[in-house]
């Protein structure tokens, strides 16, 4: 949904910034959702994906495959997962590119910068949850369902 009338949502105008995005902008665009365990633990929904994270593919041909991230290829906007390869016609094996949106992060590689990012995102989310008044309680919803 569009909130700011001064920001365009036109496909035509958004294509150029998308394809000419810098590496730092692509890092944010190449985010993946966290698994339900990590989401409850850190109170964060998604994170920019990085090299030594572990992930599981949730959509596409390779659905269900898990592994450690071998490479985050920002220029092509794909990620390579270890042991996810295919054989070319000439016999060489190549890594298969997967879009980061089709992957769920199951294990994070944490360093001090990433921990601070998690804390910052969780703090913002907690503030938003506090402001949001729940109109109905879980009991009210369940009574209406039955």
UniProtKB/Swiss-Prot annotation:
It comes from Brassica campestris. Coiled coil: none annotated. The keyword Ribonucleoprotein applies. The lineage of its organism: Eukaryota, Viridiplantae, Streptophyta, Embryophyta, Tracheophyta. InterPro entries: Rib_uL2_dom2, Ribosomal_uL24_euk/arc, Ribosomal_uL24_KOW, Translation_prot_SH3-like_sf. SUPFAM superfamilies: Translation proteins SH3-like domain. Belongs to the universal ribosomal protein uL24 family. Keywords: Ribonucleoprotein, Ribosomal protein. The keyword Ribosomal protein applies. Residues 9-18 have a biased composition (Basic residues). Residues 1-33 are annotated as: Disordered. GO terms for cellular component: cytosolic large ribosomal subunit. The gene is RPL26. This is Large ribosomal subunit protein uL24. GO terms for molecular function: RNA binding; structural constituent of ribosome. GO terms for biological process: cytoplasmic translation; ribosomal large subunit biogenesis.
